[in-house]
C-alpha cells in the first residue's frame, strides 16, 4: 500500500513539473486548480482573466 502512495506522489510531481508553472492557464482543470472558473465571453466586473479554457473564446476568470 505504501508503494501506491509513493507512485501517486511521483505521478503528481511529474505532472506538476511538466505543466510549467510559468505558463498561463490553458485548460479547465488547471483553471480550477488556480481557483478560477471558465466563462464563455468576458470576465464579469468583479473578476479578472488569468488564462483561457479550451482556446481563446473561453476565458479563465478569478476574483480580483
UniProtKB/Swiss-Prot annotation:
InterPro entries according to UniProt: Beta/alpha-defensin_C, Defensin_beta-like
Write the protein's name.
Beta-defensin 2
What gene does this protein come from?
Answer: DEFB2
Keywords from the UniProt entry: Antibiotic, Antimicrobial, Defensin, Disulfide bond, Secreted, Signal
Q: Name one GO molecular function term.
A: chemoattractant activity
For this protein, the record's SUPFAM superfamilies field holds:
Defensin-like
> Using the chain's own numbering, where are the disulfide bonds?
31-60, 38-53, 43-61
Similarity comment text for this entry: Belongs to the beta-defensin family.
Functionally, this protein is described as follows:
Has bactericidal activity.
Q: Where in or outside the cell is it found? A: Secreted
Is Plastid there in the keyword field? no
List each coiled-coil range: none
Report the leader peptide range: 1-22
Q: What GO CC annotations are associated with the protein? A: extracellular space
A biological-process GO annotation: defense response to bacterium
Domain of life of the native organism: Eukaryota
